[in-house]
Structure formats: C-alpha cells, structure tokens
Amino acid sequence: MTKKVYVKTFGCQMNEYDSDKMVDVLGAAEGLVKTDTPEDADVILFNTCSVREKAQEKVFSDLGRVRELKEANPNLIIGVGGCVASQEGAAIVSRAPYVDLVFGPQTLHRLPQMIDKRRESGRAQVDISFPEIEKFDHLPPARVDGPSAFVSIMEGCSKYCSYCVVPYTRGEEVSRPLDDVLTEIAGLADQGVREVTLLGQNVNAYRAGLTLGSTEIADFAQLIEYVADIPGIERIRYTTSHPKEFTQRLIDTYAKVPKLVSHLHLPVQHGSDRILMAMKRGYTVLEYKSVIRKLRAIRPDLSLSTDMIVGFPGETEEDFDKMMALVHEMKYDTSFSFIYSPRPGTPAANLHDDTPREVKLKRLQHLQATIEENVQRISDSMVGKIERILVERPARKDPNELAGRTENNRVVNFPAPIASHARLIGQMVDVKIVKAYPHSLRGELVLVHDDAPATTH
C-alpha cells in the first residue's frame, strides 16, 4: 500500500515552497504521496511560522489534535518544521513528547534520514542547524503542478528589523548560485510552467557569482533579465522585496523586461518615520514613495500591495494618521495588515507599549476597511477592460469554468466548454472583465494567444 504524507503550512510563500519540497523529498526517498487528510497519513508534518504569536500557538493546538492519531497508530511519524521549530528546538518535544521530528527550514532535505534514525533509535530527532544553502544540493527535481511555480532564490535575512524573528529562525541572507536558479527554472519551463515567482525573505538583496568561482556578481535585476530569456517563461513575479535595496537598476528592469508583471509587493510596515526608525527599517516614508513614483513613471498601471503593522510600541494617533495618509496616497491594491505581536528575543519586545488593545483593534479595522474600499474601487475600474491572464485550473465553484490571474494578481473566473479545458490550462488568454466581486473577477473569453481566436459555443 502506498504510504502518504500530510503537510499543514502556516505563514508565508517561502513556507509554501518549503512544504512542496518536503513532499518532493519524501516522495523521492520513501515513495510517499501527498494526502489532504491527516487521518490517512503515515507522516504528518507541520511547517510553522513564528512571525506572530497566534500562528505559533495554533501549531501546538493542531499538534494536540493529532495526538490521538499517534496513540491509535504508534508507527505514525509527526514532525514540526519551519520557523517555530528553529526557535523552539527540543522544547517542542518537551511540550509535546509524541513529536518525532523537529527540523528547520535549512534542514528539510534531511527528513528521510531523520525518519530512519527515529525508527532505529526510538528517540525524537532534532536538527535545526543552519547549513547555509546545502539543502538545494539535495532536493529532487521539482514536481510541476500547474503552469505557475515558486522558485526560491535565496535563504534568510540580514536586515534585523527590531520586531522580526526571521533572521534568528532562517539565518543570514545566502543567495543560491545563479546557474542553479536558472537550471531549475528552465526545467520547470520544459514541464509546461509559464509563470515563475522568485522567492526570498528579501529578494532584491540577491547577489551571486555569474558562474562557479566567478568574481563577477549578478544582482537581482540581472537575474530577472536572465530568467526572461528562458524559453517558455511568459511571466515573472517576485516576493518579498525590501525598500532599502530597491536599486535604480532594478527600477530600470521594469522598462527593459515586459515579462516582469506590473504588480509589486513592497512592504512599508508603517507610514510614520518615527515608527519606521524604531522598527529599524532603514528608510523614510519619502524614500519609499520615491521608489514607487519612479516605478509608476515607467509602469503607470503598476498595482501595489504591502504589509502594515498597527500598534507598534509607542504608536500615537498622529503616527497612525500618517499611515492612513500613505495608504490613500499609494492606493494599495492589497495589504497584509496585523496588530503588532511581540516576538521573544527581538529588540522591540523590550519596548514599552502603553496603547490599549481596543485602540489597536479599532485602528486595524479602520486600516483594513480603507484598503478593502480601495480594492473594490480598483476591481470596479477593471470592468469592461480586456485583461491577459494565465489560465491555471478549473474554477473552484463551477466545473464548467476556468480560473486564472491577471497581472495585478486578481483571480478571474470565466466560462469555457469542458472539452477545451485541457487545451486552455497553461495558455495565456485575453478575457473581457464583465463583473467585479470583492475578491475575484468574472470574465468572458476573447482570445487565446498562440492559437486561433476562442469560441464559447
């Protein structure tokens, strides 16, 4: 009987990428296949996030729920990976003794060996070391699932923002060799991938030798240009970037590389210089706005998303008003916004915080409502326009429809004969937007690129 692995992912797209790699590693070494049901699994893995306290506690809550599965099946392997694992280490086993494996983001490639040692010794295995970029040398070829794919180009972060635990859980910035990244993407393109998202905690800090042993360094802008030259790749996205390292060379890339989408996720975190300084972000609001102005001079239709932290220690009403002024000026398409959550071991955790939680919650609700209004306004403005999308899959709610994403990352559902689905998935098509919903769009198929004009009957 085929053995199965269940992976639950918390947090960012880096974790989503790592979860896919866990499945790939165990599939290649152990023959495991992915399941969406923990009750059917022989291996259960939690890929964790420690950016916010709520996500961290959710992990232990979920561990408690699978404990009875372990009691019913002592051969079941339960593992905890990701940033909580890096932060807590063996303390996870002390708190939940039924956990068999604890591994960090840099050691997921060692999962098969850790499982073997657990079975041989009967003892929990903990490996949260930082072997830099070693894991990429031990990962099997990626298994393609659709025309879009994530590709990790670097690991770690060296910015040490005062509130952030990532440098302590993922280590310092280390870039993958240029050849490795391009080889992986070329392999994905050969398997039908048309769109890649380049991943890193701070992708625009990417620096790598042009070739093995080369003293000539390729930066992130140059990497994008190389990726654009790979046959079959039609769209390039990336996340996450840092305003401090948004160079003029990277800005110029938006003029030189049409395949680079007109959508940017650029976390600002706050709209007050005083708070940004306390956060140790390394830029001012004016410097952030200058980057956006330069980009929109090249791409007037550039859509912008961001991250915002409300209620950072010392935040006044004036500080929050400055944040809202920035939101109105930048016209953000989306914002991942949260109330500040102090993380143990970070400098900000020692700052005095005298703002009542109800005030923070009210500010967050105001921010999110304003962003939602802007999202709807942008969606409404797209009605009647022709948008080029990459068809990714059948629509989730209606099997007679297909779904894809616009350049500004909106999901578009459109009707198409079922007989045409296999042909259209993976194609770039033009759709006319006919209706805007809060979090998606509805369209009508107009044209299939590199193909005959589409028909809907």
UniProtKB/Swiss-Prot annotation:
One of its GO terms (molecular function) is metal ion binding. Its EC number is 2.8.4.3. Its cofactor is [4Fe-4S] cluster. Pfam families: Radical_SAM, TRAM, UPF0004. Residues 143-377 form the Radical SAM core domain. It is found in: Cytoplasm. InterPro entries: Elp3/MiaA/NifB-like_rSAM, Methylthiotransferase, Methylthiotransferase_CS, Methylthiotransferase_N, Methylthiotransferase_N_sf, MiaB_methiolase, rSAM, rSAM_horseshoe. [4Fe-4S] cluster 1 binds at residues 12, 49, 83. Binds 2 [4Fe-4S] clusters. One cluster is coordinated with 3 cysteines and an exchangeable S-adenosyl-L-methionine. It comes from the Bacteria. Residues 3-120 form the MTTase N-terminal domain. The keyword Metal-binding applies. NCBIfam families: miaB-methiolase, MiaB/RimO family radical SAM methylthiotransferase. Belongs to the methylthiotransferase family. MiaB subfamily. This is tRNA-2-methylthio-N(6)-dimethylallyladenosine synthase.
